[in-house]
Amino acid sequence: MEGMCVKFDVIGLDSPCVDLAVNVRCFPKPNGAERIQNLSWQGGGKVASGMVAAARLGLCCGIMGNVGDDKYGTFCLRDFQDHGIDTEQMCVRKNRTTNFDIVISDEGSMGRSFVFYPGNAECMTEEELNIEYISNSSYFYMANLDSV
């Protein structure tokens, strides 16, 4: 792959998601409504977000994991690539969906709440893990063992 690192600083393992992040002044009461102040589409997931942050700081990063072959999976892969993260080891599951979250933050409490749709793209199997790829990194970052 052109531009790939000889050795990675960090490789992550994750089942990334797409976040629709919305900000409201306050949460509406039941059956109420509140105007959205701001919204954005973002790649998400603990490890995925960490990889993007590390890449923005100049580290050489790679990501392993799974997405569906839907528009959200395409979004995740493009977002990693736009940040210079190697996606060679990502598994794209045919006829499967990628995790999706709506992240609601409100100015009143300064908190965040999540509403999520778990995609059905299966996690990587042990057989799909490329140990040579992982060993070509100074650090390996994963959030939980459910990723495999």
Walk through the language-model features, giving the residues of each.
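Glycine-rich phosphate/adenosyl-contacting loop at the front of the ribokinase-like
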Residues: 1-66, 71-82
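Ribokinase/PfkB-type carbohydrate-kinase core domain
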Residues: 2-18, 66, 79-92, 105-148
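Flexible domain-boundary/linker segments
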Residues: 27-30, 71, 97, 119, ...
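Short, basic and Ser/Thr-rich N-terminal targeting/leader segments
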Residues: 57, 96-99
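Residue-identity detector for threonine
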Residues: 74, 87, 97-98, 125
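Active-site loop ensemble at the mouth of alpha/beta enzyme cores that anchors a bound cofactor
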Residues: 102
